[in-house]
Amino acid sequence: MSDKNQIIARASLIEQLVSKRYFEDIGKQLTELEMIYVSKEHLQETDVVRAVYRVLKNCPSVTLKKKAKCLLAKWRGFYKSTHCKPRQSPKVLHTNANKEESAAVSQDVSQDETSGSSHSEIMGLCSSLSRLLPQDAAKPAAAIGSESSTAQMEINEGYLKGDDSECTRKSSGVFQGTLVSVRSKCVELLYTALASSCTDHTEVHIWQNLAREIEEHIFTLHSNNIKKYKTSIRSKVANLKNPRNFHLQQNFLSGTMSAREFAEMSVLDMASQELKQLRASYTESSIQEHCLPQSVDGTWTNKIKCRRCDKYNCKVTVIARGTLFLPSWVQNSNPDEQMTYVICNECGEQWYHNNWVCL
């Protein structure tokens, strides 16, 4: 299949995918277009520009938009080089085309970072590709037809290499700008949370410096995973804003806790003393309930005093140690040893004791 037929097929498939909103399959088609040599005749006689522009306009993926925009910028630079100076040698044409392409991509990056008016630039880019005069249709054969297929492939490879470097540079620049803004916002959130309960305005600079130090330590811990970094920031802010965790601010002011220690603290470490005691009681109760049998039929007695409610209304039985789920510090070598097991009928308290004989 010739390059023209491949371009027509790719353009038609891209338009179908955009119409059906199957955006996950468009990336492969754009990659194939990058590997195919596209001449000025192809830009004139096919709808590839319109198809790529539809991706740029309708696709929600930022990666696909950048790839489509780089393709359009490359084609515009190629069209300008062949349209304005068609009689130059292949080497000069290759150099000028790369310069035009680099200037176009650099202009796109500067416009994205400063004004954000990429829509008008994209419209101009597509119009420059599609606005071809009738007499230009007869010139490409004289301008490019004298070049060998090897020279054409070298030009195409030069475009791809230059385009990849410019796109990588653009992506890294945009990512760095976004990361700086995210980190600044996180410092602001930490400062607001730290100073939420502060009434003394003289301590404002203390909280500002502390917020910066905390953010730097958190970023150092999770610099390779931005999701974990954001999750840690949200956790720290929520715990600092919790009125029950006022001990965190007090520890900062007293110097008992540093910014690095706070950045490395887990959710359990940041909890208040009341919550820690509640968790410990729940854990102890759960372990005790898990160790004891679920239902035991025993003998009622009023000779045993409940250790919780101090009432004499209990039910007692004897069971084998091997039937209980006991921790290692309670177990011994004899699973058949009998244990006295007591249930309070008033409050439901349950407990057991080894070698205990009830009167």
UniProtKB/Swiss-Prot annotation:
Superkingdom of the organism of origin: Eukaryota
Listed Polar residues bias regions: 104-118
SMART domains (alphabetical): TFS2M
Annotated TFIIS central domain residues: 182-298
InterPro entries cross-referenced by the UniProt entry: TF_IIS-typ, TFIIS/LEDGF_dom_sf, TFIIS_cen_dom, TFIIS_cen_dom_sf, TFIIS_N
Stretches the record annotates as Disordered: 84-118
Domain TFIIS N-terminal per the UniProt entry, residue ranges: 1-82
One example of a Gene Ontology biological process annotation: DNA-templated transcription
Protein name as it appears in the record: Transcription elongation factor A N-terminal and central domain-containing protein
Species lineage: Eukaryota, Metazoa, Chordata, Craniata, Vertebrata
